[in-house]
Amino acid sequence: MYSGNKVVISWIVSIGFVGMPEFMSSKTFALCRQRSFLHGPAGIRSDEEKENNFFGRVSFMDAALLLEYGWVLLVLIGLEGILAADNALVMAVMVKHLPEEKRKKALFYGLAGAFVLRFGSLFAISFLVNVWQVQAIGAIYLLYISASHLLKRYVFKKEDTHKETKQSGFWPTVLKVELADIAFAVDSILAAVALAVTLPGTSLPKIGGLDGGQFLVILAGGIIGLVIMRFAASMFVKLLKERPSLETAAFVIVGWVGVKLALYTLAHRDIAVVSEHFIHSGTWKLIFWGVLAAIAVCGWFMSGGKKQPEGAQNEQKNSTRERA
């Protein structure tokens, strides 16, 4: 009964189309009549339904893509913020021996260099990722900075003050800061690329060997990281004055970042000493960030407050006795 009614309705609709050719083109009229004859009235609406379903799927895919990109961007902002804070801490340590005016200038040059180098490295992503020598130089320099400071402080205690006076010039300090910026820029861009390449591709043109959407995520994360560095550098200079022993923890962190860069270098496909799978695994990320957090926490609690000179302590004791 239902199929008979369907055929009747189909014929009625098809007959009705005979009186409607002036409102549509002959091609559209023929198509509608054919579909009404074969599939009934539902066939007329099938194109519209398919179109709605298609746009529904597209909008869902767009929303999912935006959510995925947004989540990775948030993670990248946090990561770049931590690396920028490390970079700012190293700059603060390197310039703290300078007079106030020169210290501000050295910090300005260091921040300007960090801006230029990180933006430059964005457009040389393919070069930085494929050439392991660049990664190796950055790793060696960070390890050298860390080892040099720790050896001077805890092994060659007598030579430490003499060498510091020799290396307290303004421009040598700026040069050291810029070299550290290069190493941190390489580490930052490698970390950003490792996150961004996990994102699905977009229709945007490629930039620097990367998909346009992935590149924009790295760019946004890098800019926010630089803004964090701008404000963190001055804060760390003040913090190091209050907690001088925190400087040792800062150099241990520098060495640990150097170890990370060294492992990235050894995992390069041209060397392949370390498994590339291990470098990108959750186990290594957990180890790296866990050790980094442990160094920071231990350094904070072990540094304590700034010790007062003996003269100041005696004056404070005398004043308390007089009050008593």
From Swiss-Prot:
GO terms for cellular component: plasma membrane. The chain crosses the membrane at residues 4-24, 63-83, 106-128, 132-151, 179-199, 209-229, 246-266, 282-302. InterPro entries: CHP03716_TM_YkoY (IPR022493), Integral_membrane_TerC (IPR005496), MFS_trans_sf (IPR036259). Its main location: membrane. Keywords: Cell membrane, Membrane, Transmembrane, Transmembrane helix. It holds the Pfam family TerC. It is found in: Cell membrane. It is a multi-pass membrane protein. Belongs to the TerC family. NCBIfam families: R_switched_YkoY (TIGR03716). PANTHER family: MEMBRANE BOUND PREDICTED REDOX MODULATOR (PTHR30238), SLL1022 PROTEIN (PTHR30238:SF4). This is Uncharacterized membrane protein YkoY. The lineage of its organism: Bacteria, Bacillati, Bacillota, Bacilli, Bacillales. The gene is ykoY.
